[in-house]
């Protein structure tokens, strides 16, 4: 939820964003039902919620973004959270097209990288990953 000093503006903007990002909100609610007992962190500046998911659900430092909700493992570092925040900004921009324009290319790149044993450097040079780093103000040297 994005917050403004004016409460009415906050409500109006968030209703519009809720409708615009419905294709991310619905899967986020399903994930919220699955990943219970999470530690919740709210970044009011970025208007996002970060949920630290129990380690048993993922291997390594897996993270993903569904609109204004970011799911991370406990050992996920701050730069990865910033990267996922960049994807949240992409969600605001692309709205209902987010999964076609961002999620699908991102997942395909991730799977290809794993299958072909490509480096993180290789992965982060492609759009939408490069764009997410830019929007999230990621120090890429700390991620690689």
Regions found by a protein language model. Give the residues of each.
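Catalytic Zn2+-binding segment of zinc metalloproteases
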Residues: 85-104
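Short alpha-helix carrying the canonical HExxH Zn2+-binding catalytic motif
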Residues: 74-90
């Amino acid at each position: 939820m994005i917050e403004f000093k004016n409460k009415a503006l906050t409500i109006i903007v968030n209703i519009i964003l809720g409708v615009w990002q419905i294709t991310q909100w619905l899967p986020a609610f399903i994930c919220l039902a699955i990943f219970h007992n999470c530690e919740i962190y709210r970044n009011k500046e970025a208007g996002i919620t970060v949920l630290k998911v129990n380690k048993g659900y993922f291997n390594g430092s897996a993270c993903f973004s569904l609109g204004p909700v970011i799911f991370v493992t406990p050992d996920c570092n701050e730069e990865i959270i910033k990267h996922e925040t960049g994807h949240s900004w992409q969600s605001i921009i692309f709205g209902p097209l987010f999964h076609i324009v961002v999620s699908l290319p991102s997942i395909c790149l991730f799977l290809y990288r794993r299958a072909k044993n490509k480096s993180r450097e290789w992965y982060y040079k492609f759009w939408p990953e490069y764009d997410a780093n830019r929007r999230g103000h990621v120090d890429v040297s700390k991620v690689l």
